[in-house]
Amino acid sequence: MNRFNLSLLITSLLLQFLGYSVNGQEYPCEKTMVESLQHTAWVLNKPESKALWNVSLNAPIIIIDHFNNKMFFTSIEDGRVQAIKEEPWDNKVPLANSFFDYEGKRYVTIIHAALMNSPCQQRINLLSHEIFHTYQKSLGIENQYSVNYYMDEVQGRALLQIELKALQAALSGDSMRLHDALYIRTYRQSLYPNNNEDLYELNEGLAEYTGVKLSTENMQEYVKNRLNYDISRGYTNAFGYFTGSAYATILDQIYAEWRYDKDLAKGLIYLIKKAEPQYAVTINKSTLDKLLIKYDYAQIVANEKEELKSFGDIEKFKDLLKPETSKLCIANQKINFTYNPNDRVISLGDAVLLRNMSIMGEWGQIKAKNGIVRMNNWSAFYLLPPTNITNNAIQGDSYEIQINQGWKVVEEHGIYSIVKE
């Protein structure tokens, strides 16, 4: 699976839908799966929904009930839900809120538990978000995976926190706070020139904006609440959902036609500055210093440094990047994987440390619960060396691997791999 396809699985898991309320709804939704699909189909078929992007948001859908090993096939077409067909899941489709090509056809994929454990309006949000992803290319918006790993480093997180605080006030019409948010953002991006914040924000932020816009009555309040900073959350993948929907909501206030602008693909910040040129930023040290004091940057940094200690011994995973260090290597060949994009990601230079991940390949399945290294070029994944190996299983420090028949573990000079027998 190439890097492009992998990114579709990673950035669209949207596990953060679990636990969020819409308009104060925290009670369970009593609608059945079919009723929720019908409700969503009705919403998407409304004239104002079609007018949002000048497209009809129809899509084939697979809903994956992994607890009962079932897949439900259906589609939303012009306000109607097509007859549902069921077949065994058997890991044939990645467990993700995303989209996936299956047997020659592209489907939106939805985790049954993520759908059914959400409030009623949030179900519309989830479905609309993922359906938007299948249409975004027609709007000039490319699928992107986040390379903004500094969002989980101390300085990057501290500056993001200031941007989120300023954005919350900006949503209420405070133009000075919008300037603050854009100033800090510009400064952060100058520190990390290889970022793709603006493009990733388009990818996930506009999908989030679409889902919220079609499901929530008080959109401004919802988006504000999503900007509340959580020091334990990972932001490398999550930030774009929050900042993107916030800047899109601000554009609704200052530039009503922004969704149809020919320069949409250049980013939301570009459109804000195009509509309101006074928000263009030139970094000045004196102004920057005053802004950092205003938002108590020093204390934010101190808090971030303390929180980083909770991740454990990062150095033992960084050592896996050394050629001579014993490790289990998983090559990126014909694999699918999922992980929680809410979780924190630690940059290791040429790789990142993820807290947990599931990987599926023709050789079997990995469940890593507390640390797995992924190379930045996506070529391989590294785990700490195994502590126990049997014919069909590998156990290590907080990970388990089930090995399929016809495969085995081999070791050479301390480097473990899974190969065909």
What residue spans do the PLM features occupy?
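Short pre-active-site segment immediately N-terminal to the catalytic Zn-binding motif
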Residues: 112-127
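Bacterial N-terminal signal peptides
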Residues: 9-17
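Non-catalytic terminal regions of proteins
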Residues: 263-421
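Active-site-proximal alpha-helical
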Residues: 191-221, 226-286, 290
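Active-site recognition of the HExxH zinc-binding catalytic motif
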Residues: 125-137
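N-terminal mature-domain "stem" immediately C-terminal to a signal peptide or N-terminal signal-anchor/transmembrane
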Residues: 25-83, 207
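Post-HExxH zinc-binding segment in Zn-dependent metallohydrolases
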Residues: 138-193, 197-223
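Catalytic zinc-binding patch centered on the HExxH motif and its immediate surroundings
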Residues: 84-105, 117
